[in-house]
Amino acid sequence: MEFIVLLTVCALLGLSCGQHGEYCHGWTDSYGIWRPGFQCPERYDPPEATFCCGSCGLKYCCSTVESRLDQGLCPNEEDLRDGVPSIELPPTVPTYFPFLLVGSIFVSFVILGSLVGLCCCKCLKPEDDTQVSGPAPIQSRLLDQDPSTDTSRHSSSSSASMPRPPIGARPQNLCSLGAENINLYMNMPPTFPMMGCPQNAQFMHPGTAGPSFMQPPFINYAVPAEHAIIMAPAPYIDARNCYGQTSNIYCQVPQQNDQTVCSGSPSKC
């Protein structure tokens, strides 16, 4: 009885051993898709397909020993993490990153250029203002000047440029001047008393060309200061007692001639 029970158990164990083959471990196919492992034979395999055959990228069950796959050469499931190979792959770069990098560089260049331009304008603007506003006071002073001040300044400068005799010096003797420097003649009588001058001498007033017409009150301007008192009537000089008759001195001012002639007929006492 016990012998029969042992034979039955052995038969059952043999049937179980013949139905289960090798175990094919999980793998990753050529598309990167993880394939889980399975037990040979599978559902649609024949019962004799107990060997794991194929390659590391594609596994299946077969019944021939020659086609059996050595799974020790393929990566084990321990080398894989959640169906992904443990080998670290380089991270993929997003497509928008190059455009973002180029745009940021362009914006930074624009901002930097604008800042440099503003700094240059601020540095150069004060120099331009000083150069433009420098001559403004001089121009305003030149524009504010009246023509009267200009004429007075011109006349004063011209008068200053003319030579003046020293203070206390006697005026130049008119008799010593030549006839080439005269343009105003005065015919004085031969008996007229004049110090340092011979008789029949002509007296003149040096200067530039005189006017074509001269009024009688300006005749004394041509006579030196020390001789003007002789021609001008004074209260302390009695011409009638000195010369015996009233001196009749007058000036002939012809309009057609530039020369003014003064004549008189005084007589000595």
Swiss-Prot record:
Where is this protein localized, as stated in its record?
A: Endoplasmic reticulum; Membrane
The record describes its membrane topology as: Single-pass membrane protein
Q: What InterPro entries would the database entry show?
A: Shisa, Shisa_N
List UniProt keywords, sorted A-Z: Developmental protein, Endoplasmic reticulum, Membrane, Signal, Transmembrane, Transmembrane helix
Q: Which Pfam families match?
A: Shisa_N
Cytoplasmic face: residue ranges?
120-269
Indicate yes or no for the key word Signal: yes
Note in the entry: 'Shisa' was named after a sculpture form, common to southern Japan, with a large head similar to the Egyptian sphinx.
Q: What's the protein name?
A: Protein shisa-1
Source organism of the structure? Xenopus laevis (African clawed frog)
User: Which gene does this sequence derive from?
Assistant: shisa1
